[in-house]
């Protein structure tokens, strides 16, 4: 992997720096590095493709050395360099595409394609120019079964869920109480609802509890907690739990209430939050949200009409809350909304009409991967996202 990364980094730097008018001394280092790369690759033959619709191709390396000059780079020099850049970039993309459509139930983080396996041999170690990439460091640590650290913005840690839990419901569902929840990507939205607005609750306070669990623990979490839940704050016709009928979810947001969020790691309480705003949590893999809906001591006639004593109840009072994971670190590779690498992998596998593998579901859906995130999937995903990041460098 480090050899492929070094080739891609060299090509990327060469493409950026070799332009008409540049003084040669400013690009001399990258030119010499490219020539070292060419000397090492020349005389070797590699094969890519052959899976799905990917064409088989043979790469016979006989590239010319890049010359030197005492002057500024002219158009002829740049054109000659471009031909080398284009060949190397095409080679890298072909290797990456070939690697992306392969998976293994064991040792999935190790190279799987013939070319990447060949590049891992000792004869190509002189190409290892740059090993400073955090992706390479994480892959190296993971391959040694150490604990890498991945940093994510808006990490996709929540499985997609859009449902509700009923704590009370009459046969006509005109008097209901329960918890509506929506989780997806990096957000968890909750709405504790009650048609009677805690009318008969002890001390006019109705309690709701929601328990959630992540597939992988996250650490150094920066989180935003705010009132409201936009995805579930709307008039909705919902099926009843037995799918025999439907009922009307018609929430009116209530500000009277309190909440407590408890964060746990391996069953041990780690942190507790009771306030809105931006908060930090050291680490957690599960959480419990307790909401207390409080009936106001006094209400205007307009509010009383929304929740008439004894019914009928056209609305539900709803205390709403949204948790958003802004930043976090993990020891597991995840899909990140700020990176296109996962999309690159999914698109290559789809466009190549890749046959169904033994590790991931057809179509490479993140939701299904996250819902049953196995060690084999994590190992393969580590490799695939690294390869996608290499391909992105030369695209």
From Swiss-Prot:
GO function terms (MF aspect): host cell surface receptor binding; structural molecule activity
Gene Ontology CC terms: viral envelope; viral intermediate capsid
SUPFAM superfamilies noted in UniProt: A virus capsid protein alpha-helical domain, Viral protein domain
Subcellular location: Virion
Major location (coarse): virion
Record flagged with keyword Isomerase: no
Biological process, per Gene Ontology: fusion of virus membrane with host plasma membrane
Key words of the record: Capsid protein, Intermediate capsid protein, Virion
Domain of life: Viruses
InterPro entries: Capsid_hemagglutn, Rotavirus_A/C_VP6, Virus_capsid_a-hlx_vir
Functional summary from the UniProt entry: Intermediate capsid protein that self assembles to form an icosahedral capsid with a T=13 symmetry, which consists of 230 trimers of VP6, with channels at each of its five-fold vertices. This capsid constitutes the middle concentric layer of the viral mature particle. The innermost VP2 capsid and the intermediate VP6 capsid remain intact following cell entry to protect the dsRNA from degradation and to prevent unfavorable antiviral responses in the host cell during all the replication cycle of the virus.
Subunit annotation: Homotrimer. Interacts with the inner capsid protein VP2. Interacts with the outer capsid glycoprotein VP7.
Family to which this protein belongs: Belongs to the rotavirus VP6 family.
Protein name: Intermediate capsid protein VP6
């Amino acid at each position: 992997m480090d050899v492929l990364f070094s080739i891609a980094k060299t090509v990327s730097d060469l493409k950026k720096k070799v332009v008409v008018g540049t003084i040669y001394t400013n690009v001399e280092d990258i030119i010499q590095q490219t020539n070292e790369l060419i000397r090492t690759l020349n005389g070797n033959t590699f094969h890519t493709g052959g899976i799905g619709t990917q064409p088989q191709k043979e790469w016979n390396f006989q590239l010319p050395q890049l010359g030197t000059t005492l002057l500024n780079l002219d158009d002829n020099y740049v054109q000659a360099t471009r031909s080398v850049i284009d060949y190397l970039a095409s080679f890298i993309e072909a290797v990456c595409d070939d690697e992306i459509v392969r998976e293994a139930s064991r040792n999935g983080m190790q190279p799987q394609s013939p070319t990447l396996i060949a590049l891992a041999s000792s004869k190509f170690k002189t190409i290892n120019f740059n090993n400073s990439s955090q992706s390479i460091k994480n892959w190296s640590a993971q391959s040694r079964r150490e604990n890498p650290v991945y940093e994510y913005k808006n990490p996709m840690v929540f499985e997609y869920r859009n449902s509700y839990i009923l704590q009370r419901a009459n046969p006509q569902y005109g008097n209901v109480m329960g918890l509506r929840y929506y989780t997806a990507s990096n957000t968890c939205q909750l709405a504790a609802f009650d048609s009677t607005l805690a009318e008969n609750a002890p001390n006019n306070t109705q309690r709701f509890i929601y328990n959630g669990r992540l597939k992988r623990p996250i650490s150094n979490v920066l989180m935003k907690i705010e009132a409201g839940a936009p995805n579930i704050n709307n008039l909705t016709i919902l099926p009843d739990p037995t799918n025999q009928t439907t009922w009307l979810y018609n929430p009116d947001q209530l500000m009277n209430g309190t909440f407590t969020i408890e964060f746990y790691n391996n069953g041990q309480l780690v942190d507790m939050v009771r306030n809105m705003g931006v908060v930090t949590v050291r680490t957690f893999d599960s959480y419990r949200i307790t909401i207390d809906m409080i009936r106001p001591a006094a209400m205007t006639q307009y509010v009383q009409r929304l929740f008439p004593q004894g019914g009928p109840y056209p609305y539900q009072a709803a205390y709403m809350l949204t948790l958003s994971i802004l930043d976090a670190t993990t020891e597991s590779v995840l899909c990140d909304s700020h990176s296109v690498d996962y999309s690159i992998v999914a698109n290559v596998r789809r466009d190549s009409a890749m046959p169904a593998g033994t590790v991931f579901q057809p179509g490479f859906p993140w939701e299904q991967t996250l819902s049953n995130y196995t060690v084999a999937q994590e190992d393969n995903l580590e490799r695939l996202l690294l390869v996608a990041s290499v391909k992105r460098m030369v695209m």
